[in-house]
């Protein structure tokens, strides 16, 4: 059996890697560093950092914290977090991903211009909560690109000028499917919008079109998709490693599963199953591909690959 480790389209994205680097550097110098929420959506990596002294807290605990250092993770935070930090004399180390920070500014600008903002994303994802905070929590969140959830579509005001943006880790095809379906929805509601206008920069065109979209999906993440498809097809079986909380992990695993139905999702080596490494005829499979999400550390992927070689090859 040959075990192939994907080093090209798996492992931390630059935003997460930067956060981890800063956290490690801080922990080498001082103990008692707090992280507002899981520093990354990977439980194994979180436990490693907690063993170094990182203390993970939720929002209620953060609101009660006083005179302490706190790490803002790559997902970013709403303005209310910074206001609380100022009141409670908290020292923030802000590692918001630059791509996310730019998106937060975009949401704020669109709100100031009076747009109804629709975010393609997951309602409770911390990045989405942060983005929504930067537009006074006025955005409408839509997860289902086919507009199949009435709870998501009923709040849409068809009479308002509207802008569509996206959580950075959502799938590109879903974003453009949602754009197309929104165009149809507004047309059925009596607004002949035609194709919505794509904007690169907010506020530069005067006047701004009434119905616009800005593709805010991170290309470092989305560009991994084709490589991951190719990697999945090139191996007989796929072991996909990611945290259960990882939004990006769910998207990338679905890509692997579509390309190779013999794909299996794990968080750590304890979840590996021996039957994954044999054929129905009882023979050892020829190739195993190990890959993961942008929130999966390379050391964990290496650990899984080495474990497979040691116990199943």
UniProtKB/Swiss-Prot annotation:
Cofactor(s) needed: [4Fe-4S] cluster
Binding positions ((2E)-4-hydroxy-3-methylbut-2-enyl diphosphate): 41, 75, 125, 168, 246-248, 295
Residues engaged in binding dimethylallyl diphosphate: 41, 75, 125, 246-248, 295
Ligand binding ([4Fe-4S] cluster): 13, 97, 218
Gene Ontology biological process terms from the UniProt entry: dimethylallyl diphosphate biosynthetic process; isopentenyl diphosphate biosynthetic process, methylerythritol 4-phosphate pathway; terpenoid biosynthetic process
Active-site annotation: 127
Binding-site residues for isopentenyl diphosphate, renumbered to this chain: 41, 75, 125, 246-248, 295
Textual note on the cofactor: Binds 1 [4Fe-4S] cluster per subunit.
InterPro entries: LytB/IspH
Xref: Pfam families: LYTB (PF02401)
Top-rank EC class of the record's enzyme: oxidoreductase
UniProt keyword annotation of Transferase present: no
Keywords, in A-Z order: 4Fe-4S, Iron, Iron-sulfur, Isoprene biosynthesis, Metal-binding, Oxidoreductase
Gene3D superfamilies: 3.40.50.11270, 4-hydroxy-3-methylbut-2-enyl diphosphate reductase, catalytic domain
Family as reported in the entry's similarity comment: Belongs to the IspH family.
Function: Catalyzes the conversion of 1-hydroxy-2-methyl-2-(E)-butenyl 4-diphosphate (HMBPP) into a mixture of isopentenyl diphosphate (IPP) and dimethylallyl diphosphate (DMAPP). Acts in the terminal step of the DOXP/MEP pathway for isoprenoid precursor biosynthesis.
UniProt name for this protein: 4-hydroxy-3-methylbut-2-enyl diphosphate reductase
Name of encoding gene: ispH
């Amino acid at each position: 059996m040959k075990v192939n480790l994907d080093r090209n389209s798996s492992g931390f994205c630059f935003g997460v890697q930067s956060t981890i680097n800063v956290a490690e550097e801080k922990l080498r110098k001082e103990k008692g560093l707090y992280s507002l929420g899981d520093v990354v959506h990977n439980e194994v990596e979180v436990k490693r950092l907690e063993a170094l002294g990182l203390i993970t807290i939720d929002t209620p605990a953060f609101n009660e914290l006083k005179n302490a250092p706190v790490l803002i993770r790559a997902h970013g935070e709403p303005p209310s977090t910074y206001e609380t930090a100022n009141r409670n004399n908290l020292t923030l180390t802000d590692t918001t991903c630059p791509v996310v920070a730019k998106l937060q500014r975009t949401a704020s600008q669109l709100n100031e211009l009076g747009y109804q903002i629709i975010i393609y994303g997951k309602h409770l994802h911390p990045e989405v909560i942060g983005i929504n905070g930067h537009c006074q929590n006025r955005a409408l969140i839509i997860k289902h690109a086919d507009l199949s959830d009435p709870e998501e579509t009923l709040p849409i005001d068809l009479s308002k000028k509207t802008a569509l943006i996206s959580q950075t880790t959502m799938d590109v095809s879903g974003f453009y499917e949602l754009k197309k379906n929104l165009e149809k929805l507004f047309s059925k509601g009596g607004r002949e919008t035609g194709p919505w206008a794509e904007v690169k920069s907010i506020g530069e065109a005067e006047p701004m079109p009434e119905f616009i979209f800005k593709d805010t999906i991170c290309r470092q993440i989305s560009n991994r998709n084709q490589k991951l498809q190719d990697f999945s097809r090139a191996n007989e079986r796929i072991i996909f490693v990611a945290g259960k909380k990882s939004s990006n992990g769910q998207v990338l695993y679905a890509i692997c599963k579509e390309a190779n139905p013999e794909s299996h999702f794990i968080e750590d080596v304890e979840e590996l199953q021996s039957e994954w490494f044999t054929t129905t005829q009882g023979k050892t499979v020829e190739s195993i591909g190990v890959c993961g999400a942008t929130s999966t550390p390379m050391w964990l992927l290496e650990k899984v690959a080495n474990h497979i070689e040691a116990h199943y090859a």
